């Protein structure tokens, strides 16, 4: 048991030393940073600390790596950046943590206290900069308050709906000495459902004829997934996962019906619309899973919703639930052991049909795209050779459909994908995942435009010996935007074409392994060589530009749009 020092016997330490000790106290084992002179005292204190420091090439990448670790562990990912441009560069990662409900703490250097308010070199008001995307923004002006405010930062990042906290550190505060006790390690509070609420849920399920469940959000665990899987199996309950949350339910289970993402299976939507009870656990039913807020009426849904969420403010925020349950997914799923059907449920065929529809939708066999490289066969090969616990990472772009539709997620903490749709996330997320669990295989899917948003972090993977594999789909364009152009302004291509480097040579220039893949037959041996190389690898896959989605072409979209004019 940790016994904190008392103020009377605490040694005098600098603010930087006190801060690093608080990180250790709260269980931090790794952090990500781009160094800056504004927090040199912290860097010096880290020299002697048992914390693995990953030095990154750009603050956005560092923040995304920290967010990825927060997403995988449920503990705050830690990132340090310098003031001004360092902070603004990191903002993309903070925004991801906000929309993904990921615990994260961004520490930002700040100008000396005496210079505040004078627009000093690289000075920013971090409350104004991050106020709309962080749960809390605080500046620590007194080293004696470091334990108090860091403890609060960990609590804020993990409680209720998790999210990012931003802590500003004036450089002279970090060098000032103080005698202060360390805080006790933070603990995450679980909000539990009441027995009466669980009895009401059982009654609602018992009366339903076609219920469904939708899983999303954060504050899940491997145990919680197992518990909900057992519950769904007992009730033969069709289960759907929210946008980029497929890791919350095993895709090979007979109750799994697919995910509510982009380009969703129309049969899936029809089943949810026809349901007479919707159990939502952890998610918020935000824009993408709600299909542009069209799947459920606001504020009074046609389908009765039982909404379970860790944050009371999310219950009834958009949709008036028939039954709100204020509980974390972990506490709620533990209570589900007592919720079992009194008799055989009448909708088992409904669940079987939903799973059959998912299997047909995710079948790679009928998928044919223009060009010599058939991505359906590529996905089938990945399913054949990769371990089930492979961590898949992606940023934003049409390329991500290949993962979300065709990879069967069966393992918790195996998916790193931003619900915010942030481009460039996949590579730094892969670095963060591999740094956390080096024994796990990590595969990054990226587009050509997406990859170069944070492609420099390939150097970070090389520096730390992290053999991630990047499957880079190159169609020489910002494909998603081009797709929308053809739908809205057919034939009028504007600002979406790209001239790309040789990504095989790019990987090799950094000291990694590179392959160029132009045909289906070349992919399997290229992947095998990459896996055997022991190096960070890029498989530069050249895709026919017409193959804009697994089932659609640019020409087809253009023709359809022109026919409507």
Which sequence ranges carry the predicted segments?
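Active-site diphosphate/adenylate-binding microenvironment
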Residues: 19-20, 34-37, 42-43, 47, ...
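Glycine-rich phosphate/diphosphate-binding loops that line cofactor/substrate pockets in enzymes
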Residues: 17-28, 68-74, 98, 156-161, ...
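A short, small-residue-rich loop immediately preceding and capping a beta-strand
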Residues: 29-33, 52-54, 72-111, 214-217, ...
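Glycine-rich, anion-gripping cofactor-binding loops and their flanking helix/strand elements
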Residues: 71, 218-306, 408-431, 435-440, ...
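Glycine-rich, acidic loop regions that bind phosphate or pyrophosphate groups
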Residues: 108-149, 171, 245-353
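Thiamine diphosphate
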Residues: 107, 115-122, 269-272, 316-318, ...
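Phosphate/pyrophosphate-binding active-site segments
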Residues: 2-10, 144, 180-181, 203, ...
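Conformationally flexible catalytic loops at phosphate/diphosphate-handling active centers
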Residues: 140, 152, 156-207, 362
């Amino acid at each position: 048991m940790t016994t904190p020092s008392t103020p009377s016997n605490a040694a005098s330490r600098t603010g930087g030393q006190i801060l690093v000790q608080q990180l250790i106290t709260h269980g931090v084992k790794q952090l990500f940073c781009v160094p800056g002179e504004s927090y040199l005292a912290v860097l010096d204190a880290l020299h002697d600390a048992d914390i693995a420091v990953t030095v990154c090439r750009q603050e956005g990448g560092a923040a995304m790596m920290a967010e990825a670790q927060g997403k995988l562990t449920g503990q705050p990912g830690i990132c340090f950046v310098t003031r001004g441009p360092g902070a603004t560069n990191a903002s993309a990662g903070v925004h991801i943590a906000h929309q993904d409900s990921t615990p994260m703490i961004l520490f930002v250097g700040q100008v000396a206290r005496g210079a505040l308010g004078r627009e000093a070199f690289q000075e920013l008001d971090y409350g104004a900069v991050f106020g709309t995307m962080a749960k809390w923004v605080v500046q620590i002006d007194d080293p004696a308050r470091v334990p108090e405010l860091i403890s609060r930062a960990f609590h804020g990042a993990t409680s209720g709906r998790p999210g990012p906290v931003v802590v500003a550190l004036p450089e002279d505060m970090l060098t000032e000495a103080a005698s202060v006790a360390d805080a006790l390690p933070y603990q995450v509070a679980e909000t539990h459902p009441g027995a009466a609420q669980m009895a009401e849920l059982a009654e609602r399920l018992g009366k339903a004829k076609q219920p469904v469940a939708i899983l999303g959000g954060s504050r899940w665990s491997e145990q919680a997934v197992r518990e909900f899987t057992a519950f769904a199996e007992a009730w033969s309950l069709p289960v759907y996962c929210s946008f980029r949350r497929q890791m919350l339910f095993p895709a090979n289970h007979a109750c799994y019906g697919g995910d509510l993402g982009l380009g969703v299976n129309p049969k899936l939507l029809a089943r949810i619309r026809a349901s007479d009870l919707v159990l939502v656990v952890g998610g918020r039913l935000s824009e993408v899973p709600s299909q542009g807020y069209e799947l459920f009426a606001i504020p009074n849904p046609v389908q009765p919703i039982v909404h379970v969420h860790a944050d009371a403010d999310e219950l009834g925020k958009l949709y008036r639930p028939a039954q709100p349950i204020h509980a974390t997914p972990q506490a709620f799923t533990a209570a589900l052991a007592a919720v079992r059907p009194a008799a055989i449920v009448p909708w088992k065929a409904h669940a079987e049909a939903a799973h059959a529809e998912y299997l047909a939708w995710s079948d790679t066999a009928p998928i044919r795209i223009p060009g010599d490289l058939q991505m359906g066969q590529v996905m089938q090969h990945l399913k054949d050779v990769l371990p089930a616990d492979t961590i898949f990472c992606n940023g934003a772009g049409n390329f991500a459909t290949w993962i979300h539709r065709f990879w069967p997620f069966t393992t918790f903490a195996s998916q790193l994908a931003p619900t915010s749709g942030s481009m460039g996330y996949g590579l730094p997320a892969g670095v963060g995942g591999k740094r956390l669990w080096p024994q796990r295989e990590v595969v990054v899917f990226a587009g050509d435009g997406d990859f170069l948003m944070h492609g420099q972090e390939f150097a970070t993977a090389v520096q730390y010996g992290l053999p991630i594999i990047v499957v880079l789909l190159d169609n020489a364009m910002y494909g998603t935007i081009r797709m929308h152009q053809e739908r809205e302004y057919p034939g009028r291509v504007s600002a979406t074409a790209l001239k790309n480097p040789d990504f095989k040579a790019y990987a090799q220039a950094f000291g990694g392994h590179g392959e160029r893949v132009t045909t289906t037959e070349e992919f399997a041996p290229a992947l095998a060589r990459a896996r055997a190389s022991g190096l960070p690898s890029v498989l530069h896959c050249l895709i026919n530009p017409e193959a804009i989605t697994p089932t659609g072409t640019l020409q087809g979209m253009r023709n359809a749009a022109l026919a409507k004019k």
